[in-house]
From Swiss-Prot:
Keyword Cytoplasm: yes
Role description: Required for maturation of 30S ribosomal subunits.
InterPro entries: Ribosome_maturation_RimP, RimP_C, RimP_N, RimP_N_sf
Entry keyword Iron-sulfur: no
Gene Ontology biological process terms from the UniProt entry: ribosomal small subunit assembly; translation
Compartments, as annotated in UniProt: Cytoplasm
Recorded name of the encoding gene: rimP
Record's protein name: Ribosome maturation factor RimP
GO cellular component terms listed in the entry, alphabetical order: cytosol
Record keywords: Cytoplasm, Ribosome biogenesis
Disordered as annotated region, ranges: 162-185
Family the entry assigns: Belongs to the RimP family.
Amino acid sequence: MSSPPRGEVAARLEPVVAEAVSAAGFDLEELDVQQAGRRRLVKVVVDAEEGVGLDEISEISRAVSKVLDAHEHVLAGSYTLEVTSPGVDRPLTRPRHWRRARYRLVRVRLADGSDLVVRVGEADDEGVVVLADGEIRTLAYRDVERAVVEVEFQQPPAEDLVRLERAADGAPERGGDRGDTEESR
């Protein structure tokens, strides 16, 4: 009996794997099935609003393993299961990725070819409020070609976070937020 092509296997398994991951309270970010010698490697990438810890990875692994065992006819043989969370270099491609990146520094390539480094504020289903070059602005997802979180080794400036919070609350910016107070002149 021949086994179905790799992409077809993942497509057939995705609904049941997504259901198992969702039932555990997580989001399925990616499902990949590759041939690895005589076995298949099933890679499941999961995430959640609060991140994913090792205990949760174990829980999800058990749930997905049960589902895969029940659908072993799709895999057509033995498999190795790898459950992981996304790496820091994962592109932000969905609104939930942007929500999880709140207050993080992100490198953005816009559809017009320009690049920005922004601090992420509130995100909804259409776009995200960011602090870019000292200015609060809104980026529509349709205008973003690629976005990746930048690794930071220090806490973000408190004034940046305050400005993003005020923008989320709809409060107007005040001059003191940009450092143009009497004391800073």
